[in-house]
């Protein structure tokens, strides 16, 4: 009887430790706020949000945005 209680306890301990490993290795999905690229799933943190890929607008896009606001 004591052997069964010990083995069940060990089994539950292993399951608990595996759940903790999954939680600590979880990455942030696209659109989530981030502070560094390593925390995002696609390893791309742009302007404090996870995006894939990291697109930086060029002069043409900024000019279109300027005229759109007028």
From Swiss-Prot:
Main location: secreted
Propeptide, residue positions: 61-70
Tissue: Expressed by the venom duct.
GO cellular component: extracellular region
This protein's UniProt keywords: Amidation, Cleavage on pair of basic residues, Disulfide bond, Secreted, Signal, Toxin
Disulfide linkage: 27-41, 34-46, 40-50, 45-54
Single GO term (MF): toxin activity
InterPro entries: Conotoxin-I_CS, Conotoxin_I2
Signal peptide bounds: 1-26
Localization per Swiss-Prot or TrEMBL: Secreted
Proline amide carried by residues: 57
Free-text comment on this protein's domains from its UniProt entry: The cysteine framework is XI (C-C-CC-CC-C-C).
Family the entry assigns: Belongs to the conotoxin I2 superfamily.
Listed name of the protein: Conotoxin Ep11.12
Source taxonomy: Eukaryota, Metazoa, Spiralia, Lophotrochozoa, Mollusca
